[in-house]
Design a protein with these regions (language model features):
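Buried hydrophobic core positions in alpha-solenoid tandem helical repeats
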Residues: 16-17, 86, 90-91, 145
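An alpha-helical repeat/solenoid feature that recognizes helix-turn-helix modules
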Residues: 1-11, 22-85, 94-140, 157-185
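Short alpha-helix boundary/capping elements
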Residues: 20, 94, 146-150
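Short glycine/proline-rich, acidic loop/turn segments that cap or connect secondary-structure elements
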Residues: 140-155
């Protein structure tokens, strides 16, 4: 992306590495604390002191996927040992419940909303890091996508999602790009 040599990018990625949970993945601090809703709103809705995470709590596959996307764009950091360790955590969590309440239902993996992590975003992230369908966990995710292609050649957006043609077409494009990057035609 042209920013590999930019010190600000380096500083940001190093900060993300320092913010990992003890298990090597990421989450957000408000999830690691037992907070009441009004406290979460106060902490996230205005000026407040930064909340430090409880690093002993487990990683979230959702937040780990989001953070790993930043590392995939950097030629050096996507090969970093700690980043690879986090990628292994993400890979091992495919189709499993998240550690935190908002995504505990494994069906969220196959609910395709453009801005939230799901099976496709995880496979895009892992593919960009060099993982391929020879890996059994990646193969299982790829197989799910292939097996769940609709008769019209597109994919459904997921349980409870209204079918919008344009969104389904964009989803199909992204899936096809990921499959092509995997060498699957």
């Amino acid at each position: 992306a042209g920013y590999a040599e930019d010190r600000r990018i380096d500083d940001g990625l190093l900060w993300l590495l320092r913010m990992r949970q003890d298990d090597g993945g990421w989450t957000i601090p408000v999830l690691t604390r037992e907070l009441k809703w009004d406290e979460i709103v106060r902490l996230t809705g205005g000026d407040s002191e930064p909340l430090q995470p409880d690093r002993s709590r487990p990683f979230s596959h959702n937040w780990t996927d989001m953070v790993l996307r930043a590392f995939t764009a950097h030629p050096f950091y996507k090969r970093n040992r700690d980043v690879r360790r986090a990628a292994e955590l993400l890979k091992g969590s495919l189709f499993r419940p998240d550690s935190y309440s908002s995504y505990r239902d494994p069906r969220y993996w196959t609910r395709f909303v453009g801005w939230w992590p799901n099976l496709l975003t995880a496979l895009e992230t892992l593919t960009a890091m060099g993982y391929d369908a020879r890996d059994p966990e990646i193969c299982r995710g790829v197989a799910w996508l292939i097996e769940n292609q609709a008769g019209d050649g597109l994919w459904d957006l997921g349980p409870g999602r209204p079918e919008k043609a344009l969104e389904r077409e964009w989803l199909a494009l992204r899936i096809c790009l990921m499959l092509t990057a995997q060498g699957i035609r």
